[in-house]
Amino acid sequence: MAKIGFVSLGCPKALVDSEQILSRLKALGYETSPSYEEAELVIVNTCGFINEAVEESLEAIGEALKENGKVVVTGCLGARPEKIRERHPQVLAVTGPGEVERVLEAVQEVLPAPRDPFLDLIPPQVKLTPRHYAYVKLSEGCDHRCSFCIIPKLRGRLRSRDAADVLAEAARLVATGTKELLLVAQDLSAYGVDLGHRESLWGDRPVRAELKDLLTHMAELGVWIRLHYVYPYPHVKDLLPLMAEGKVLPYLDVPLQHASPRILRLMRRPGGYESHLKTLKAWREVVPELALRSTFIVGFPGETEEDFQILLDFLEEAELDRVGVFAYSPVEGAEANRLPDPVPEEVKEERKARLLEVQARVSLRKNQRFVGKTLEVLVDELPEPGLAVGRTYRDAPGVDGVVYVETDGTVRVGERIPVRILRADTYDLHGVQA
C-alpha cells in the first residue's frame, strides 16, 4: 500500500488543514508513515506568517528532500511558490493553503490512489490531536488589513462554513470521544458575516451562520467549547450569557496586540489602553470568572519607551490570565515594513523580557487565588501511576498552563475530574483529586 509521510507546521488552523488532507488520503487508500525511509512521498504543510516560520518551513522542506527526495508542499508559504522554488526547485508541486484537491492531484500524479474513495460510505477522519479534544475551523481567510499581517494575501478573504456543516462535524467528533471542541478561525467573531448569517438545516432545525446561534446549538452536545482568535467586536458581549450559563467555557482568546493608541493606529488595530480596559471590565461584570488570553507585539516600528510603558501599565491593570508576546519581525509583503523608525533588535528583545517579567507576576498572583478551591480538570496525560496532567477552563492545550493532579489511580485520559488546588506556580497549578 502506498505510504505518505507528513510534516505539519504552524497554527491550529493549519493543523485542521493537515487533518483534512490526511483524511482524504486515507479515504483514497493511502497509509501514513512516521519515517522518511518508509514513505514513498512526503507532504509538508508550511507556515508563512513571520520570517522565523518561513525559515522553519524551508528547512523542513529541505530535510524532507534530503531524507526522501519526493516532496509536495502546501500551506501558507505555498501562496508564495517562488520563495519555495528559489531554495528548493526540485519539489514536485507547490499548493496554497486550503487547496486540498490540488494536494491530492499532486500526490496521485506520483502515487496512483490505491482504491476508489466511493467504496467507503463514510470516509475515515484523521485527527492529529489526542482523541479527547479537537480543533474545528469555522471559516477561512480574513477581511482585516492589519499592517503587520499578510494572512489575507495568503489565505484570501473571509469564507465561512454553513452552520449545519460545522455542527455536523462537531457531532461526529463528539460521537467518537471528543470532550473539548476548540473553535478556530482567522477571526472567529466575524463568522458568517460573508454569508449574510444565512440559515442552514441541521437535521430539521434551521441554524444561522452566526456565532451565538451556532454556539447555542453546539452546547447541546454537552462538551467543553473553547473560543480562539476572537476579534474584540462589540457583539462579543452577546456570547457572554452562554458562558455565564455554563454552555460555553468562560474563556476568550482575544489578540489585542498593544495598548498604546498610537501604535495600534499604526498597526491598523482598534482600541487602546482605556477602551481595552473598558471592554474587559464590561465582560467581567457579566462573567466574573472569565479567563482572558491575549497576544502582544513589542518593538513595532515607531514604538517608543513611552508606548511600551503604556503596554506594561495595561498588563498590570488588566490582569490577563494568559499572555503571548512576539518581538516584531518584518513580514515580507506587509505594509508595516514601510513604516519609519524601526526598533533595534536588542531593544525588542529587552522589551519582550520586561513584558514577560511583568506578566509572570500577574500570572502568579492570579494563580494563587485558586489555591484552596476545587476546579474541574480535563485529563490530558497520565505520565505515571497516581499522577495526571490536565487543564482547567482557563487553559487551552499547548499554549496555556496545566494542572498536576495526585489521583486515586483510576482516572482516564479525557475524563473530567474535580481537583482541589493545593499550590500555585507562575503558570501551573498543583492539586489532588477531590
UniProtKB/Swiss-Prot annotation:
Segments forming domain TRAM: 368-434
Cofactor annotation: [4Fe-4S] cluster
One of the protein's GO biological processes: tRNA modification
GO MF entries: 4 iron, 4 sulfur cluster binding; aspartic acid methylthiotransferase activity; metal ion binding; protein methylthiotransferase activity
Domain Radical SAM core: 128-365
UniProt-listed SMART domains: Elp3
Top-level EC class: transferase
Location(s), subcellular: Cytoplasm
Binding site for [4Fe-4S] cluster 2: 142, 146, 149
GO cellular component, one term: cytosol
The keyword Transferase belongs to this UniProt entry's keyword annotation: yes
The protein's Enzyme Commission number: 2.8.4.4
Catalytic activity: L-aspartate(89)-[ribosomal protein uS12]-hydrogen + (sulfur carrier)-SH + AH2 + 2 S-adenosyl-L-methionine = 3-methylsulfanyl-L-aspartate(89)-[ribosomal protein uS12]-hydrogen + (sulfur carrier)-H + 5'-deoxyadenosine + L-methionine + A + S-adenosyl-L-homocysteine + 2 H(+)
InterPro entries reported in the protein's UniProt record: Elp3/MiaA/NifB-like_rSAM, Methylthiotransferase, Methylthiotransferase_CS, Methylthiotransferase_N, Methylthiotransferase_N_sf, NA-bd_OB-fold, Ribosomal_uS12_MeSTrfase_RimO, rSAM
Family: Belongs to the methylthiotransferase family. RimO subfamily.
NCBIfam families: 30S ribosomal protein S12 methylthiotransferase RimO, MiaB/RimO family radical SAM methylthiotransferase
Biological role stated in the UniProt entry: Catalyzes the methylthiolation of an aspartic acid residue of ribosomal protein uS12.
Record-given protein name: Ribosomal protein uS12 methylthiotransferase RimO
